[in-house]
Curated annotation (Swiss-Prot):
This is Deoxyuridine 5'-triphosphate nucleotidohydrolase. The gene is dut. It catalyses: dUTP + H2O = dUMP + diphosphate + H(+). Pfam families: dUTPase. Its cofactor is Mg(2+). It is an enzyme of class 3 (hydrolase). It comes from Syntrophotalea carbinolica (strain DSM 2380 / NBRC 103641 / GraBd1).
């Protein structure tokens, strides 16, 4: 397994560093660092601060993903998933969560609220053409293979 170094800056004295929770985990858990409890009403969304900023190396991105346990047990997930952290972003990581559940969801400082996966980035060079190669699928879109 390849490793890279990512610089982390604590923006708040109580900020917790992302952490892998098992030896082969692909994602590091991200921790909430609000000033106090944050209550997210059913159907509502909010941004939860993490208290950290990252310097992701050029050639990589951070993908912020939901935690499956929060989705299963509370109906809480991320609004934009995966969220992308570019290599040139240096601000605080904020996690935009939404409560699809039926009850208030309370986020407390130190709660694990999302996962961070580091992935390589490949930049595309676009080539304008008059025609595209034919495929068996061609323009078949949403649900074209059945439900």
């Amino acid at each position: 397994m390849k490793t890279i170094t990512i610089k982390v800056k604590r923006l708040h004295s109580k900020a917790m560093l992302p952490a892998y929770m098992s030896p082969h985990a692909a994602g590091m858990d991200l921790y909430a660092c609000p000033d106090g409890e944050v209550v997210v009403k059913p159907g509502c969304r909010t941004i939860v601060p993490t208290g950290i900023a990252l310097a992701i190396p050029v050639g990589y991105e951070g993908q912020v993903r939901p935690r499956s346990g929060l989705a299963l047990h509370h109906g809480v997930t991320l609004v934009n998933t995966p969220g992308t952290i570019d290599a040139d972003y240096r601000g605080e990581l904020g996690i935009i969560i939404i409560n699809h559940g039926d009850e208030d969801f309370v986020v407390s400082p130190g709660d694990r609220i999302a996962q961070l996966v580091i992935a390589p980035v490949h930049r595309a060079v676009l080539e304008t053409v008059e025609e595209l190669d034919e495929t068996d699928r061609n323009e078949g879109g949403f649900g074209h293979t059945g439900f």
